[in-house]
């Protein structure tokens, strides 16, 4: 398969970036998108040119690091997959593929296709956890009854990998889907009730401080999410936030 890649190159967050064109050949349909970029980088290194910087880690759709905008879509044309799970058979011989970093004020470019998504870490650190006293009086989790529907919904919310596709897909660069998933996975379980008020207030406030936009119910985030996180989580977080505001 012969392709033309048009890739965003940018030396750092303050530099002016540009699209650079790279022809590439010999690409097989069974290659992943990242393996295709590996082939390109091997060619660039052989020529003495600087390789394209992109983020990746597990390459199994778990870590959320491989966040790329491919032909204008977060993670590319396939659904419910991350970039590392996208195979080149989704493209045709002779195609031109545009590859860019995720675009958001809160995701500054580090270099080329890599962005700094530590804003998500700070939102998580603000309240995405449960405080536990482990000094000998911890109760076995299985001893606390949990409604099956709540358990299923909490598990579904917890599958969020924090890749940032929701932000990249949103016209407002909103992080509501990510934040609501992290709020929901605890709001639905008894273990999360003790800190529920402080959690939702702290996480939403941190989200706003990071410079993410607001949600206007477009729904692009749910469509592009590789884990299929539901918009229902945003509605739940709004309810949790309202309850917490009234208590405060």
Task: Please name every model-derived segment.
Residues 1-23:
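Eukaryote-biased recognition of intrinsically disordered, low-complexity regulatory segments
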Residues 8, 25, 70-72:
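Short strand-turn-strand beta-turns centered on an Asx-Gly dipeptide
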Residues 20-32:
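Short, contiguous acidic and Ser/Thr-rich linear segments
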Residues 31-50, 100-248:
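Ferredoxin-type iron-sulfur electron-transfer modules in oxidoreductases and energy-metabolism complexes
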Residues 53-65:
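Short, structured protein-protein interaction patches enriched in aromatics and acidic/basic residues
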Residues 62, 68-70, 221:
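Functionalized membrane-embedded alpha-helices
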Residues 70-94, 99:
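Glycine-rich phosphate/adenylate-binding loop and adjacent beta-alpha elements
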């Amino acid at each position: 398969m012969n392709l033309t890649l048009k890739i965003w190159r940018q030396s750092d967050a303050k530099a002016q970036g540009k699209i650079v064109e790279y022809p590439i050949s010999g690409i097989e349909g069974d290659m992943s998108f990242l393996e295709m970029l590996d082939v390109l980088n091997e060619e660039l290194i052989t020529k003495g040119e600087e390789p394209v910087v992109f983020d990746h880690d597990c390459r199994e759709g778990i870590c959320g690091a491989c966040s790329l905008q491919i032909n204008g879509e977060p993670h590319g044309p396939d659904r419910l997959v991350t970039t590392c799970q996208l195979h080149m058979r989704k493209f045709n011989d002779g195609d031109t593929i545009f590859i860019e970093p995720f675009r958001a004020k809160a995701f500054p470019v580090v270099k080329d296709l890599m962005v700094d998504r530590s804003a998500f870490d700070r939102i998580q650190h603000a309240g995405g956890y449960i405080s536990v006293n482990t000094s000998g009086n911890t109760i076995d989790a299985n001893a606390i009854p949990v409604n099956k529907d709540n358990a299923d919904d909490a598990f579904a919310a917890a599958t969020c990998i924090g890749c940032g596709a929701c932000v990249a897909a949103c016209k407002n660069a909103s992080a509501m889907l990510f934040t609501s998933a992290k709020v929901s996975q605890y709001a639905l379980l008894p273990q999360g009730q003790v800190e529920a008020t402080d959690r939702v207030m702290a996480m939403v406030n941190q989200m706003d401080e990071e410079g993410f936009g607001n949600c206007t119910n477009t729904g692009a985030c749910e469509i592009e999410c590789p884990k299929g996180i539901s918009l229902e989580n945003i509605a739940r977080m709004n309810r949790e936030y309202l309850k917490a505001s009234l208590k405060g």
